């Protein structure tokens, strides 16, 4: 997302500093549903509290400086998830992507038969996989795990299936769009925070280096 798109989408309505606590309040305008959402970011005790209509996230696990941590040109949602201490919704929901499961099963079978790509497999093997996914699979991660485990065990007599199926299921889970949304907003705020503080006569350096 470009800077211009962020400016059009987000509107800072207030920034308030009380001691070493900084609060940033924003409105978010969404053209897709013609709605406006409210979000509050609170920086306090080297933690970041993100809350509002889009969910709640608390970051702070082993972060050296909360005001600099999220700065940059691209978000790092996977690494930042390790720094999230709490969230109102799962960052990785307990549903799996059926197409991704099928893709990862195909990759595993290719490795099992030591071929470089799926088309090199025997037609009989490809038919077995095709039949398995013809009508879809369970999307709940635990049921999907059991289903794929039994399938690979029965059809391919695979060994060490626990770790194999675990990797398949984990690889097929999609990260929460609300969490990614929050990461984008947090990074945009941190990238602009110093300028906003100057405009409001807030001592930004004091926030970076509290006494």
Model-derived segments and their meaning:
Residues 1-20, 115-131, 135:
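Eukaryotic non-globular interaction segments with acidic/serine-rich, low-complexity composition
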Residues 1-57:
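Short N-terminal edge-element motif at the start of the domain
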Residues 118-211:
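A eukaryote-biased signal for long
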Residues 17, 28-36, 61-64, 68-75, ...:
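Intrinsically disordered, low-complexity coil segments
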Residues 71-131:
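An exposed acidic His-Trp-rich patch
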Residues 39-85:
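Aromatic- and glycine-enriched beta-alpha-beta binding-site module
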């Amino acid at each position: 997302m470009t800077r211009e798109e962020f400016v059009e989408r987000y509107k800072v309505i207030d920034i308030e500093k009380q001691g070493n606590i900084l609060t940033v309040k924003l409105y978010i305008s969404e053209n897709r549903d013609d709605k406006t959402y409210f979000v509050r970011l609170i920086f306090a005790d080297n933690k970041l509290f993100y809350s509002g209509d889009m969910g709640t996230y608390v970051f702070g696990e082993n972060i050296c400086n909360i005001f600099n941590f999220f700065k940059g040109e691209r978000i790092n949602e996977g690494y930042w998830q390790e720094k999230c201490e709490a969230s109102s919704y799962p960052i990785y929901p307990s549903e799996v992507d059926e197409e991704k499961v099928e893709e990862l099963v195909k990759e595993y079978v290719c490795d099992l038969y030591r071929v470089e790509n799926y088309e090199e497999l025997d037609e009989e093997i490809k038919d077995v996989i095709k039949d398995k996914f013809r009508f879809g699979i369970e999307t709940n991660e635990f049921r999907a795990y059991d289903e794929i485990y039994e399938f690979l065990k029965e059809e391919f007599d695979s060994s060490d299936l626990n770790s194999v199926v675990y990797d398949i299921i984990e690889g097929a889970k999609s990260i929460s769009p609300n969490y990614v949304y929050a990461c984008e907003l947090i990074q945009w705020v941190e990238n602009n925070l110093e300028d906003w503080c100057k405009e409001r006569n807030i001592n930004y350096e004091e926030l970076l280096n509290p006494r």
